Regions:
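N-terminal pre-ligand scaffold of iron-sulfur
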Residues: 2-42, 46-68, 91, 100
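Glycine-enriched alpha-helix->loop->beta-strand junction motifs that scaffold or abut catalytic
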Residues: 221, 239-242, 260-263, 350-355, ...
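Glycine-rich phosphate/ribose-binding loops and adjacent secondary-structure elements
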Residues: 304-460
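Active-site beta-loop-alpha junctions enriched in small/polar residues
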Residues: 200-202, 229-231, 247-249, 269-271, ...
Length: 529
């Protein structure tokens, strides 16, 4: 069955009946409001969330004033082309679209507009007109992960609860929630719950967001991962279950930091942009971030695609053994995205991994080339099922901790992930939403309206650290409590006892992806009569 075509965009709001002259700086990137809702016209402030619109990125070609469109009818955004003259004054502040038959010179070439039938039309025209000059060497960039509508749905996995063949547990029966990361390590990391805050760097997130996440996780009895931007001292001090991530750029890494961490992992990749490295825009590299990362202020922070001096399992094993020597034996693991899953897991196991953080398609980031975000990686549901099956085959189950991440949001999602074989779940998007993120998907612009993914001091002041940390604590506590409700209904007194027998799906393809039972009745064999 073919997928339904996406609905056409609604008409934008006419923000004003005239253009506005604004100063631009050559080489600087700006984000133009396309929806008309922004209070910071003509630039985006995140108000497009839920509108179906996305802001338009452009780089100023020269320093000076430019006349930018506010009527949202221009055929050459962000610049005014005179179309505002055709907008009735009474339509200011309302949704409106000029009839394209009257929108410009009848003798001129028409303006390309993407349609449900040809959704890539504008990209093709952009590449044909400008090459990579405007969009950058890796193509257009977007924030967060693949839209959820393009992924297998956790909601299409059904939980099978107990009744006769297995009895459910009463509401007063305790349900264990502990997660031990790296049980074979000399100093395994013990969390009170199987949820933790995933890797998000200081730089991608504000200091206030990092402190709120660390404090909220600590209050909930769980840990936080550092992200690849180095150790923010205030974050580390706020949480005594701190998992340090070392990425190929090795930002700010020094051995003297190791006694302050409780687990350590190498970053091999992340679902939204594995194989291409990463970059924090220079506008986000404040003096504090530059000092922690050991890089120049105001310059882009680039991380290579792979470690330069660590290539073989033996190389990583030697590095990991040094980490253990300096820390008394904390767990050492890998964060990897779901690509060549079995081969990459074998590499990590050969390198001595105590734990694995597997990021499936659906996992997000502050900014990734859409060429990668929208076209790489195995979806989280299938990736998790394959990883657990492979660890079972290798005899690593119970020895190497498997933590899944990438698109999980709700208590039901987390229960299903545990049943599919995850030992723990690392939450990124859900965690930042709990502290205030409203899903504007403009993290890479430094204009986050909630103060979460920005270094702008005015926007950062919107995030109250204490209030945000309490929100995360409540979210994690409520999520685990609801997970316990479902575990009792399935007859389990430990969350870790959830298994594939607790799941089925009426989507046959999804059942095969997940390695679980199909809910339907298989047809009887055909006979010849």
């Amino acid at each position: 069955m073919s997928e339904p075509l996406p609905a056409p965009l609604p008409a934008p709001v006419v923000a004003a009946g005239t253009p506005i002259s604004v100063p631009l700086e050559k080489g600087k990137e700006y984000w133009y409001c396309a929806c008309g809702r922004s209070a910071d016209q003509p630039f985006c402030d995140g108000s497009h969330e839920g509108s179906g619109f996305t802001p338009i990125a452009f780089v100023a070609e020269r320093t000076g004033k430019a006349l930018l469109c506010r009527c949202k009818q221009t055929g050459s955004p962000p610049f005014c082309d005179g179309t505002h003259a055709r907008v009735p004054p009474e339509r200011v502040g309302t949704s409106y679209r000029v009839d394209e038959r009257d929108a410009g010179d009848r003798g001129a070439m028409p303006t390309p507009r993407a349609t449900p039938e040809e959704p890539d039309l504008e990209l093709i025209h952009e590449l044909a007109e400008h090459g990579l000059e405007a969009v950058g060497s890796e193509g257009p960039v977007g924030a967060m992960g693949v839209p959820r509508s393009l992924l297998p749905h956790w909601d299409d996995l059904q939980i099978l609860t107990a009744q006769l063949a297995r009895r459910p547990l009463e509401a007063d029966v305790p349900v264990g929630t502990e997660l031990v990361i790296g049980p074979r390590a000399a100093r395994p990391l013990r969390l009170e719950i199987p949820l933790l805050v995933s890797d998000m760097s200081f730089g991608a997130l504000s200091e206030e967001a990092k402190r709120a996440l660390a404090t909220g996780a600590e209050r909930a009895g769980t840990g936080i991962c550092s992200g690849e931007g180095g150790m923010l001292p205030e974050e580390q001090a706020a949480n005594h279950r701190y998992l340090y991530e070392l990425a190929p750029a090795m930002f700010g890494y020094r051995e003297e930091l190791l006694p302050r961490v409780q687990a350590f992992h190498f970053k091999a990749g992340q679902a939204a942009k594995t194989g291409v490295g990463s970059q924090l825009p220079g506008v986000k590299v404040s003096a504090r971030i530059a000092a922690i990362r050991g890089i120049p202020e105001g310059q882009p922070a680039r991380s290579p695609a792979a470690f330069q001096d660590l290539r073989t399992p033996a190389d990583f094993r030697r590095f990991g053994e040094r980490v253990k020597e300096l820390t008394g034996g904390i767990p050492v693991g890998f964060k990897l995205s779901a690509q060549h899953i079995e081969a990459d897991l074998d590499f990590a196991l050969a390198a001595g991994a105590d734990y694995l953080i597997l990021d499936g398609r659906g996992g997000g980031t502050g900014g990734a080339p859409l060429l990668f975000r929208d076209h790489i990686a195995v979806p989280t549901i299938a990736a998790l099922a394959r990883a657990r099956a492979h660890l079972d085959r290798r005899g690593a189950t119970g020895q190497v901790t498997l933590i899944i991440t990438g698109g999980l949001r709700t208590p039901a999602d987390c229960v299903k992930a545990l049943a599919l074989g995850a030992d723990g779940i690392a939450l990124a998007n859900a965690a930042i939403q709990a502290i205030g993120c409203v899903g504007s998907r403009i993290c890479h612009t430094d204009r986050c309206p909630a103060g979460v993914a920005t270094q702008d001091p005015v926007l950062r002041r919107r995030l109250d650290v204490e209030r945000a940390s309490l929100r995360l604590q409540r979210f994690l506590g409520a999520t685990v409590a609801l997970m316990q409700v479902l575990a009792r209904a399935c007859g389990h007194s430990q969350l870790r006892d959830l298994n594939r027998n607790d799941l089925a799906s009426w989507h046959r393809d999804l059942a095969e992806l997940a390695g679980i039972a199909w809910s339907g009745a298989a047809p009887p064999p055909r006979t010849l009569g």
